[in-house]
């Protein structure tokens, strides 16, 4: 997911996206623990996507406050 895609989302959509990513991260960690994970790089991708969503949500909140 690109940062431009995330910037186009509303605050509610960002919250939903964050929840989806956290669920995916949980499932990936579970698969890794049980030895079923095929693409281990996906864990890092999801972690960075979560950081992007949180960063942009914080920026939007700061802009709305200012």
From Swiss-Prot:
Keywords: Ribonucleoprotein, Ribosomal protein
Gene3D superfamilies linked: 1.10.287.310
Keyword Ribonucleoprotein attached: yes
A Pfam family reported for this protein in Swiss-Prot or TrEMBL: Ribosomal_L29
GO biological process, one term: translation
Domain of life: Bacteria
Cellular component, GO, one term: cytosolic large ribosomal subunit
Database matches in InterPro entries: Ribosomal_protein_uL29 (IPR050063), Ribosomal_uL29 (IPR001854), Ribosomal_uL29_CS (IPR018254), Ribosomal_uL29_sf (IPR036049)
Molecular function GO terms recorded: structural constituent of ribosome
Family to which this protein belongs: Belongs to the universal ribosomal protein uL29 family.
NCBIfam families per UniProt: L29
Name of the protein described by the UniProt record: Large ribosomal subunit protein uL29
Species: Agrobacterium fabrum (strain C58 / ATCC 33970) (Agrobacterium tumefaciens (strain C58))
Gene designation per UniProt: rpmC
């Amino acid at each position: 997911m690109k940062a431009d895609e995330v910037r186009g989302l509303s605050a509610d959509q960002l919250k939903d996206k964050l929840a989806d990513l956290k669920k995916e991260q949980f499932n990936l960690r579970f698969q890794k623990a049980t030895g079923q994970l095929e693409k281990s790089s996906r864990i890092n991708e999801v972690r960075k996507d979560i950081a992007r969503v949180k960063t942009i949500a914080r920026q939007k909140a700061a802009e709305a406050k200012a």
